[in-house]
Amino acid sequence: MKDDDIRSTRNKKGWLLPYLIRLDGMFFGRWEYLFKIIEEDRIPKGPIPQIPFKAVEEYTERLVQKNIKKCIDRGYRELSSSLGLFIDWIMWGLGRGEEFPRVSEEIDDFWYRTFNLGLFYKEPADHWSMIAMESMSTGNGHGFFPTPASVVKMMTEMTFAGGFQENQKRASMMDPCCGTGIMFLYASNHTLNIQGNDISPLLVKMAKINAFIYIPWLAYRPKGLTIFDKTEDDLQSIDLKTQHSLVSDRSGGVSVSEPHISKELLTELSKKEKIK
């Protein structure tokens, strides 16, 4: 394939997953940590793989913000809802969504060549909150104004302060107005048991993308996993066996997703270097 040929992701649902797994393995190792939990149906002793989240404004270069805006701005040349379609395009790349978003081959090609997933690992943060705030702060009945990262960090540290580390990993955390999921990010350094809701389907999708990149145990939880079942000795844990799909409904509900992902599948997908 020549470099100037159109790259299409229309028939490549899930094409981002092998890149995501490789990047996570290079930086944080959280997907491998989750696969170990699934294989053993047991939470390993020791700390959860940590991610040093920061506020977006703490990154001088703001590479992720520039990259996202470049993609969205290109879409607005042809689309009135570029942000929503771009989010759907990423979701398609993560193996989610029922159908490919309605974008032209040219936009699909531009986004494929331009979107840089690796930057999210270089600048770990809730980048979607800033994008959503700029898009939804005015003229929108569901206006969005995110809680500052410094406040979220403080709230998380206060919530989990003084607790026994091994028990905290099973303690349930629920955000009833999760937005793009910033509370999930900071809480993920302490617990594996996370869920939330939001009234906006767009924000829910952004939270899902954050989950795939940073919080795999929120993005994927297979049937039969018993690590969060209630026991007489652990009243902090809750039974999540019936919550296996991270999908948004009309009321903005969020539940844990169950894409068709396995370690074997992702290993096979990782052998494919690029879309052809």
Located regions from the model:
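Class I S-adenosyl-L-methionine
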Residues: 2-190
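Conserved S-adenosyl-L-methionine
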Residues: 145-242
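Long, ordered, amphipathic alpha-helical scaffolds
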Residues: 217-276
